[in-house]
């Protein structure tokens, strides 16, 4: 039985985002040579702003292969640029007009929360490899993460820009590879990428100051591990803890999923229903982060048994937090959640 108490987490205040302060050869804020019309087209399709490193990395890939800039890392690293990069590549213009693509679902993998947007995949369809995370639709992404979509919901932060994410992956591959030809190929890409990133002033560290500043504002890690950052004021209004630990909530979910009958499953849902009542109380007192956490955990657990509850909790939480685009993405995702055929431009 779920305990009857719940509380706000102490010390979960929200402060301003810290800007990166590193010495660079060249300002990283210089704009990539991508036309304003093309930028607007990308942002209009997704209703999101993209960071400058997104465009700089595209120009880097164009230098590697001007004819197929989405694929120059495919042969060497198995990486392919997708989703918003498809717009830069003009792939959306090749789509048959008989069907209208849903950009909320384009390359949205099974475990991708609304805060995340796929930008790179690995080995064709095997993984959401690079995903950028923003805590609110009106903010720029804080980091690039890695998720093995066929394994679980865990997301591992890998630098605060695309160059860092690919560089760190390259370093890992260089340690694993034994073939001399591949080693030289990796080193060649690494040298070019490192030089470009340094010229533009991008950090190649796995965990930067900007990421550490976000970590301080995370109120709960959630099942995917990278945490949630709902607005929390100086009086700690905005979030209160769930009455169950992550481990206990996972056990409750496991019991529900493995129930031998519908009757047993309904009984096993009792703790979840009680927590939903707590969420209602929390929402009444502006602690919207509680419903966001419970909904996200149930979404991340992955079972279709939790889709209905997640569909009640998450869109409401996002709307209360004025993150309406995330509510829309979540509704679309839960209505069309799948593990394959996620390329909206596929024939």
From Swiss-Prot:
Protein name: Putative histone PARylation factor 1-like
Keyword Acetylation assigned: yes
Pfam name, any one: HPF1
Chain positions with N-acetylmethionine modification: 1
Any one GO cellular component localisation term in the record: nucleus
PANTHER family referenced in this protein's UniProt entry, alphabetically: HISTONE PARYLATION FACTOR 1, HISTONE PARYLATION FACTOR 1-LIKE-RELATED
Protein family according to the UniProt entry: Belongs to the HPF1 family.
Gene Ontology terms, MF aspect: histone binding; poly-ADP-D-ribose binding
PTM-bearing positions, type N6-acetyllysine: 187, 234
GO biological process, one term: double-strand break repair
Superkingdom of the source species: Eukaryota
Keywords: Acetylation
Organism of provenance: Homo sapiens
Leader sequence residues: none
Residues passing through the membrane, by range: none
């Amino acid at each position: 039985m779920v305990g009857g108490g719940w509380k706000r987490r102490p010390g979960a205040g929200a402060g301003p985002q810290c800007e990166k302060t590193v010495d660079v050869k060249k300002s990283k804020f210089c704009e990539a040579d991508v036309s304003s019309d093309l930028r607007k087209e990308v942002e209009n399709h997704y209703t999101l702003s993209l960071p400058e490193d997104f465009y700089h990395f595209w120009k880097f890939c164009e230098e590697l292969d001007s004819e197929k800039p989405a694929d120059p890392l495919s042969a060497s690293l198995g990486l392919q640029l997708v989703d918003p990069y498809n717009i830069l590549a003009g792939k959306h213009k090749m789509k048959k007009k008989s069907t209208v693509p849903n950009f909320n679902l384009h390359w949205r993998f099974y475990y991708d929360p609304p805060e995340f947007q796929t930008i790179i995949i690995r080995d064709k369809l095997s993984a959401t490899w690079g995903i950028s995370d923003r805590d609110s639709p009106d903010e720029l992404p804080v980091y690039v993460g890695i998720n093995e979509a066929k394994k679980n919901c865990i997301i591992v932060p890998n630098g605060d820009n695309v160059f860092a994410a690919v560089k760190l992956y390259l370093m890992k591959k260089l340690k694993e590879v034994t073939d001399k030809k591949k080693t030289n190929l990796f080193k060649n890409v690494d040298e070019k990428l490192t030089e470009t990133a340094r010229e533009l002033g991008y950090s190649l560290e796995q965990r930067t100051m900007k990421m550490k500043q976000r970590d301080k504002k995370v109120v709960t890690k959630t099942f995917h591990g990278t945490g949630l950052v709902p607005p929390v004021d100086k009086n700690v209004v905005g979030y209160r803890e769930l009455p169950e630990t992550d481990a206990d909530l996972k056990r409750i979910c496991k019991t529900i999923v493995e129930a031998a009958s519908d009757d047993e499953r309904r009984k096993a849902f009792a703790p979840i229903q009680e927590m939903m009542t707590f969420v209602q109380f929390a929402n009444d007192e502006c602690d919207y982060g509680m419903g966001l956490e419970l909904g996200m955990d149930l979404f991340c657990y992955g079972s279709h048994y939790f889709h209905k509850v997640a569909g009640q909790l998450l869109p409401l939480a996002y709307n209360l937090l004025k993150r309406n685009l995330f509510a829309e993405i979540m509704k679309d995702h839960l209505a069309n959640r799948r593990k394959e055929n996620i390329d909206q431009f596929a024939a």
